């Protein structure tokens, strides 16, 4: 209202007409002419709310994840490990290498959460593959930030599963109208489902080993350290 109690229009204030949420045109004209159906208006409203709460929750998840990384490397002393005082047995990295890596991973923690939110209704295998692909891109950013040093590869794997599971559970709670925090057992249950998908890698590797052995070929040099340990000792490592 103005000093004379007369409502002030947007044009008087030098502002453009309010945009329609559906088409972007003049909202008043769309409302007056009933340009859009009520079903479309409700759908768009739900989409706006979904996007808002997804982005807000993804930011919170990413902040918590990077805070955990910084707390871990800051814990001192940690004999044999990187801390604020020394590099322990890791001569190719130091405290600041971890800080650089942690900073580079922030957007990927958001991405993991968003993947779980947006694709939580897919099968566990398909959701896991989406998270794996994003995790591989996150690894590339980590190596770029650290000059080729592996500071958080295992953590990326674990956080992709955790943040992805968290995103799925948050979306389910949002659809039911439930407020955070979400049940811990629900998040742990989703982590277990996604983690079990990764164990299929070992089964595929075992089959490759059998074929190679039968053909008299040597084992592939492209195995990861985890795959080599599994082949030698049957230990599942991060996947288990």
Question: Each PLM stretch: what is its role?
Answer:
Residues 2-9, 13-54:
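Long, contiguous binding/interaction regions
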Residues 4-8, 29-32, 157-158, 165-167, ...:
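Short, well-ordered, mixed-charge alpha-helical segments that flank or form enzyme active sites
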Residues 13-17, 39, 136, 149, ...:
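Short, amphipathic alpha-helical segments
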Residues 24, 139, 195-196:
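Histidine-centered, metal-coordinating catalytic motifs and their short helical/loop contexts
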Residues 27-30, 87, 121, 143-145:
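Glycine- and acidic
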Residues 47-121, 128, 166-240:
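Phosphate-rich cofactor/ligand-interacting catalytic cores and adjacent structured alpha/beta frameworks
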Residues 110-168:
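Long, hydrophobic/aromatic-enriched structural stretches that serve as scaffold segments
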């Amino acid at each position: 209202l103005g000093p004379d109690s007369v409502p002030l229009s947007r044009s008087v204030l030098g502002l453009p007409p309010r945009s329609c949420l559906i088409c972007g045109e003049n909202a008043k004209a769309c409302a007056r002419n009933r340009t859009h159906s009520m079903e479309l208006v409700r759908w768009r409203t739900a989409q706006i709310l979904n996007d808002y709460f997804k982005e807000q929750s993804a930011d919170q998840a990413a902040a918590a994840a990077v805070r955990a990384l910084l707390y871990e490397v800051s814990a001192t002393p940690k004999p044999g490990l990187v801390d604020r005082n020394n590099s322990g047995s890791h001569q190719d990295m130091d405290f600041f290498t971890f800080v650089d890596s942690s900073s580079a991973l922030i957007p990927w923690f958001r991405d993991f959460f968003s993947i779980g939110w947006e694709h939580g209704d897919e099968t566990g295998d398909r959701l896991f593959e989406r998270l794996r692909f994003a995790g591989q891109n996150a690894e590339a950013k980590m190596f770029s930030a650290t000059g080729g040093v592996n500071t958080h590869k295992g953590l990326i794997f674990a956080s992709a599963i955790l943040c992805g599971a968290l995103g799925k559970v948050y979306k389910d709670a949002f659809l039911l109208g439930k407020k955070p925090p979400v049940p811990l057992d629900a998040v742990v249950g989703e982590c277990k489902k996604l983690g079990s998908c990764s164990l299929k890698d070992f089964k595929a590797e075992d089959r490759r080993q059998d074929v190679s052995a039968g053909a008299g070929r040597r084992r592939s040099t492209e195995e990861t350290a985890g795959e080599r340990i599994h082949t030698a000792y049957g230990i599942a490592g991060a996947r288990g």
